[in-house]
Amino acid sequence: METAKPRILVVEDEAAIRDGLTDLLVYHGFEVDAVGDGRDGLQKALSGQHDLLLLDVMLPGRDGFAICDEVRKVDRDVAIIMLTAKTSDDDIVNGLALGADDYIAKPFSIAQLVLRVKAVLRRSRALAAAAAQIKLAGDVEIDVQNLSGRRGKESLTFTRREMEILEYLQRNTQRPVSRDELLTRVWGYDRSAEIETRTVDIHVAKLRRKIEVDAKEPRSLITVRGAGYRLLVSA
Protein backbone atom coordinates (compact mmCIF):
# COMPACT_ATOMS: atom_id res chain seq x y z
CA MET A 1 0.00 0.00 0.00
CA GLU A 2 1.32 3.43 -0.91
CA THR A 3 1.90 5.71 2.08
CA ALA A 4 0.10 9.05 1.96
CA LYS A 5 2.40 11.99 1.35
CA PRO A 6 2.67 14.57 4.14
CA ARG A 7 0.66 17.68 3.26
CA ILE A 8 2.13 21.14 3.81
CA LEU A 9 0.51 24.57 3.71
CA VAL A 10 2.77 27.43 2.61
CA VAL A 11 1.55 30.94 3.51
CA GLU A 12 3.93 33.44 1.88
CA ASP A 13 3.05 36.72 0.17
CA GLU A 14 6.16 36.98 -2.04
CA ALA A 15 5.22 35.05 -5.18
CA ALA A 16 8.77 34.08 -6.12
CA ILE A 17 9.45 32.60 -2.68
CA ARG A 18 6.03 30.95 -2.52
CA ASP A 19 6.44 29.31 -5.93
CA GLY A 20 10.00 28.28 -5.17
CA LEU A 21 9.00 26.66 -1.88
CA THR A 22 6.12 24.86 -3.56
CA ASP A 23 8.33 23.43 -6.30
CA LEU A 24 11.01 22.45 -3.80
CA LEU A 25 8.65 20.66 -1.43
CA VAL A 26 6.82 18.86 -4.23
CA TYR A 27 10.20 17.71 -5.57
CA HIS A 28 10.98 16.24 -2.15
CA GLY A 29 7.76 14.25 -2.06
CA PHE A 30 5.28 16.47 -0.23
CA GLU A 31 1.79 17.58 -1.19
CA VAL A 32 1.64 21.37 -1.06
CA ASP A 33 -1.07 24.02 -0.84
CA ALA A 34 0.14 27.61 -1.12
CA VAL A 35 -1.53 30.98 -0.55
CA GLY A 36 -0.26 34.54 -0.40
CA ASP A 37 -2.75 36.21 1.93
CA GLY A 38 -3.02 35.91 5.70
CA ARG A 39 -6.81 35.63 5.77
CA ASP A 40 -6.84 32.85 3.19
CA GLY A 41 -3.95 31.24 5.00
CA LEU A 42 -5.82 31.23 8.31
CA GLN A 43 -8.90 29.67 6.73
CA LYS A 44 -6.86 26.86 5.17
CA ALA A 45 -4.73 26.42 8.30
CA LEU A 46 -7.88 25.83 10.36
CA SER A 47 -9.15 23.16 7.95
CA GLY A 48 -7.21 20.41 9.74
CA GLN A 49 -6.00 19.02 6.42
CA HIS A 50 -2.27 19.67 6.81
CA ASP A 51 0.59 18.00 8.63
CA LEU A 52 2.77 21.12 8.69
CA LEU A 53 2.32 24.87 8.22
CA LEU A 54 5.06 27.13 6.83
CA LEU A 55 4.01 30.64 7.84
CA ASP A 56 5.66 33.87 6.79
CA VAL A 57 5.45 36.45 9.58
CA MET A 58 4.79 39.56 7.50
CA LEU A 59 1.57 38.92 5.57
CA PRO A 60 -1.32 41.01 4.27
CA GLY A 61 -4.63 40.44 6.04
CA ARG A 62 -3.37 38.50 9.07
CA ASP A 63 0.27 38.10 10.02
CA GLY A 64 1.91 34.77 10.72
CA PHE A 65 1.85 35.27 14.49
CA ALA A 66 -1.93 35.76 14.42
CA ILE A 67 -2.39 32.64 12.29
CA CYS A 68 -0.21 30.61 14.65
CA ASP A 69 -2.15 31.86 17.66
CA GLU A 70 -5.56 31.04 16.16
CA VAL A 71 -4.46 27.58 15.00
CA ARG A 72 -3.00 26.65 18.39
CA LYS A 73 -6.32 27.44 20.08
CA VAL A 74 -7.89 24.49 18.27
CA ASP A 75 -5.01 22.31 17.03
CA ARG A 76 -1.99 21.43 19.18
CA ASP A 77 -0.79 18.66 16.88
CA VAL A 78 -0.09 20.30 13.52
CA ALA A 79 3.55 21.34 13.08
CA ILE A 80 4.24 25.06 12.57
CA ILE A 81 7.44 26.59 11.22
CA MET A 82 7.70 30.38 10.97
CA LEU A 83 9.52 31.94 8.02
CA THR A 84 10.74 35.32 9.15
CA ALA A 85 13.05 38.19 8.36
CA LYS A 86 12.60 39.20 12.01
CA THR A 87 15.34 37.71 14.16
CA SER A 88 15.28 39.84 17.32
CA ASP A 89 14.82 38.03 20.63
CA ASP A 90 11.35 39.54 21.07
CA ASP A 91 10.16 38.22 17.71
CA ILE A 92 11.60 34.77 18.32
CA VAL A 93 10.09 34.60 21.81
CA ASN A 94 6.73 35.77 20.47
CA GLY A 95 6.55 33.09 17.77
CA LEU A 96 7.62 30.26 20.05
CA ALA A 97 5.37 31.46 22.87
CA LEU A 98 2.39 31.28 20.53
CA GLY A 99 3.17 27.64 19.82
CA ALA A 100 5.42 27.59 16.76
CA ASP A 101 7.69 24.55 16.65
CA ASP A 102 10.52 26.29 14.87
CA TYR A 103 11.53 29.43 13.04
CA ILE A 104 13.76 29.92 9.99
CA ALA A 105 15.28 33.32 9.26
CA LYS A 106 15.34 34.67 5.72
CA PRO A 107 17.41 34.30 3.65
CA PHE A 108 17.53 30.59 4.42
CA SER A 109 19.37 27.58 3.04
CA ILE A 110 17.18 25.34 0.89
CA ALA A 111 18.92 22.27 2.28
CA GLN A 112 18.33 23.37 5.88
CA LEU A 113 14.67 24.10 5.21
CA VAL A 114 14.07 20.62 3.82
CA LEU A 115 15.99 19.02 6.69
CA ARG A 116 13.95 20.88 9.28
CA VAL A 117 10.64 20.05 7.62
CA LYS A 118 11.56 16.38 7.49
CA ALA A 119 12.81 16.44 11.08
CA VAL A 120 9.59 17.97 12.40
CA LEU A 121 7.48 15.37 10.61
CA ARG A 122 9.78 12.53 11.68
CA ARG A 123 9.55 13.54 15.33
CA SER A 124 5.78 13.62 15.02
CA ARG A 125 5.79 9.96 14.00
CA ALA A 126 8.22 9.09 16.80
CA LEU A 127 6.00 10.77 19.37
CA ALA A 128 3.11 8.55 18.33
CA ALA A 129 5.16 5.51 19.38
CA ALA A 130 6.38 7.00 22.68
CA ALA A 131 5.59 5.87 26.20
CA ALA A 132 2.02 6.60 27.23
CA GLN A 133 2.64 8.55 30.46
CA ILE A 134 5.28 10.54 32.30
CA LYS A 135 5.01 11.12 36.06
CA LEU A 136 6.81 14.01 37.74
CA ALA A 137 7.13 15.55 41.19
CA GLY A 138 4.29 17.71 42.46
CA ASP A 139 1.56 15.25 41.44
CA VAL A 140 2.14 15.87 37.73
CA GLU A 141 0.99 13.27 35.21
CA ILE A 142 1.55 13.76 31.49
CA ASP A 143 -0.38 11.99 28.73
CA VAL A 144 2.12 11.89 25.87
CA GLN A 145 -0.23 10.77 23.13
CA ASN A 146 -2.92 13.35 23.85
CA LEU A 147 -0.53 16.28 24.46
CA SER A 148 -2.16 16.84 27.82
CA GLY A 149 -1.72 16.25 31.52
CA ARG A 150 -2.54 17.49 34.97
CA ARG A 151 -0.80 19.06 37.95
CA GLY A 152 -2.94 18.20 40.92
CA LYS A 153 -6.43 19.27 39.84
CA GLU A 154 -5.15 21.68 37.18
CA SER A 155 -5.40 20.55 33.55
CA LEU A 156 -2.35 21.02 31.34
CA THR A 157 -2.01 21.23 27.58
CA PHE A 158 1.18 21.01 25.55
CA THR A 159 2.26 21.77 22.02
CA ARG A 160 3.72 18.89 20.06
CA ARG A 161 7.21 20.40 20.30
CA GLU A 162 6.94 20.71 24.08
CA MET A 163 5.92 17.07 24.31
CA GLU A 164 8.76 16.02 22.03
CA ILE A 165 11.22 17.70 24.40
CA LEU A 166 9.69 16.01 27.45
CA GLU A 167 9.59 12.64 25.72
CA TYR A 168 13.23 12.85 24.64
CA LEU A 169 14.37 13.93 28.11
CA GLN A 170 12.29 11.13 29.64
CA ARG A 171 14.00 8.55 27.42
CA ASN A 172 17.37 9.89 28.59
CA THR A 173 16.44 10.62 32.19
CA GLN A 174 19.62 9.00 33.55
CA ARG A 175 21.79 11.85 32.22
CA PRO A 176 21.73 15.56 31.35
CA VAL A 177 20.98 16.43 27.73
CA SER A 178 22.78 19.38 26.19
CA ARG A 179 21.14 22.14 24.18
CA ASP A 180 23.06 21.01 21.11
CA GLU A 181 21.75 17.46 21.50
CA LEU A 182 18.18 18.70 21.81
CA LEU A 183 18.59 20.86 18.72
CA THR A 184 19.99 17.90 16.80
CA ARG A 185 17.68 15.15 18.04
CA VAL A 186 14.41 17.01 18.60
CA TRP A 187 14.61 19.89 16.13
CA GLY A 188 16.66 17.94 13.58
CA TYR A 189 19.26 20.64 13.09
CA ASP A 190 22.51 19.83 11.32
CA ARG A 191 25.38 19.60 13.84
CA SER A 192 27.47 21.92 11.68
CA ALA A 193 24.81 24.64 11.55
CA GLU A 194 25.16 27.77 13.65
CA ILE A 195 21.91 27.74 15.61
CA GLU A 196 20.63 30.14 18.25
CA THR A 197 20.29 27.98 21.38
CA ARG A 198 17.83 30.47 22.91
CA THR A 199 15.19 28.43 21.09
CA VAL A 200 15.71 25.61 23.58
CA ASP A 201 15.74 27.92 26.59
CA ILE A 202 12.43 29.50 25.57
CA HIS A 203 10.73 26.12 25.30
CA VAL A 204 12.18 24.95 28.61
CA ALA A 205 10.95 28.11 30.34
CA LYS A 206 7.45 27.49 28.95
CA LEU A 207 7.50 23.88 30.11
CA ARG A 208 8.60 24.83 33.61
CA ARG A 209 5.70 27.23 33.95
CA LYS A 210 3.39 24.31 33.21
CA ILE A 211 4.90 21.38 35.09
CA GLU A 212 6.64 22.97 38.07
CA VAL A 213 5.02 24.21 41.27
CA ASP A 214 7.59 27.01 41.21
CA ALA A 215 9.19 27.57 37.80
CA LYS A 216 12.03 29.51 39.44
CA GLU A 217 12.89 26.54 41.65
CA PRO A 218 12.38 23.55 39.32
CA ARG A 219 12.23 20.07 40.83
CA SER A 220 11.55 18.06 37.68
CA LEU A 221 13.07 19.84 34.68
CA ILE A 222 16.40 20.85 36.15
CA THR A 223 19.48 22.57 34.75
CA VAL A 224 22.79 20.76 35.17
CA ARG A 225 25.39 23.50 35.06
CA GLY A 226 27.68 23.18 32.07
CA ALA A 227 25.90 20.04 30.83
CA GLY A 228 22.31 20.84 29.87
CA TYR A 229 18.88 19.77 31.11
CA ARG A 230 17.65 16.68 32.91
CA LEU A 231 14.11 15.44 33.56
CA LEU A 232 13.64 13.76 36.94
CA VAL A 233 10.69 11.38 36.70
CA SER A 234 8.73 9.81 39.55
CA ALA A 235 8.22 6.08 39.96
Predicted regions and their residues:
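Short, positively charged loop/turn segments that connect secondary-structure elements
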Residues: 189-198
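N-terminal/domain-start alpha-helical segments
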Residues: 1-126
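DNA-binding patch around the recognition helix
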Residues: 127-134, 157, 202-235
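Short, flexible hinge/linker loops that cap or flank conserved catalytic cores
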Residues: 1-3, 74, 134, 150, ...
